[in-house]
Each structure stands twice: as C-alpha cells, then as structure tokens.
C-alpha cells in the first residue's frame, strides 16, 4: 500500500517552472501487482515508503517505461502483465501519465493488449492518444 505524506521544512524550495518536467497523474491497469492504481501529484518531491512487496519498485518501473528503452528492470514486456490469483491468463496492461513540461502538458501511455501478449509481445506507445514510435518519448 502506498501512502501520501508531507514533509514540512522551514526553508521553502521551489522548482523553476521554465525547467520543470514532472508527472501530475499516473494510472496503471493490470501492471505487475496493480489491478488499478491512480495517483495525482502536485510537482513536489515524492518519497515511496512501504513494506517489501508493496509495489514501490513496480511504480518506479512504470514511470521508467514512459521513457525510451525497456524500463529499469529490463523485463520482457509479457512479464509486466498482472496475473490474477483467479486466472493465469493475460488480460493486457497499461500505463498512462499526464506529464507537465515548460511547453505545456501532454498525455503519454504505453501498454499491451491481451492478444498482443500471446502473438507479438511489443508494447504500444501513445502520445496524446496517437500511436508513436518509442523514440517519440525522448523528443518530448
């Protein structure tokens, strides 16, 4: 379980918005140990705290998959699918995030449909709802 926390400091620290790139919302569906997860952020630093197996690294892996490459664990894309204790069949997985940039916000997403997991294990990338090559993530 992930909890939200706030740390008070006597010294206010602000990020210059002309350089800031940050995730304001992230949604995971069928990804690793998450059936559904929706988190919203305000641009402040985030600390993930929880017991072993709570999903901290899985959340970081989800963020890393919104950049070009194979993610921080370099896992096979078919392994990213959440397997339910009730059913071992794949149902697809997705990660989407609203990313704030100096040029304005955009929506980025990646995932696999269930039929793609068994046929051709390649994840799809979408930016603002349009299919894109993986390198398009680096251009934003």
Predicted features and spans:
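Pre-Walker A-like glycine/lysine-rich segment at the N-terminus of P-loop NTPase domains
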Residues: 2-7, 14-64
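Nucleotide-state sensing region of NTPase/ATPase domains
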Residues: 67-140
């Amino acid at each position: 379980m992930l909890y939200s926390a706030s740390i008070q400091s006597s010294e206010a620290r602000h990020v210059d918005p002309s350089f800031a790139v940050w995730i304001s919302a992230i949604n995971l569906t069928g990804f690793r140990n998450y059936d559904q997860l929706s988190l919203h952020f305000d641009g402040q630093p985030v600390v993930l705290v929880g017991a072993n197996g709570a999903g901290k690294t899985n959340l970081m892996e989800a963020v890393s998959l919104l950049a070009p490459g194979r993610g921080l664990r370099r896992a096979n894309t078919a392994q990213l699918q959440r397997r339910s204790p009730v059913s071992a069949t794949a149902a697809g997985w997705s990660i989407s995030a609203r990313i704030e940039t100096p040029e304005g916000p955009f929506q980025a997403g990646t995932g696999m449909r269930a039929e793609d997991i068994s046929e051709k294990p390649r994840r799809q990338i979408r930016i603002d709802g349009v299919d894109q090559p993986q390198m398009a993530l680096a251009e934003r």
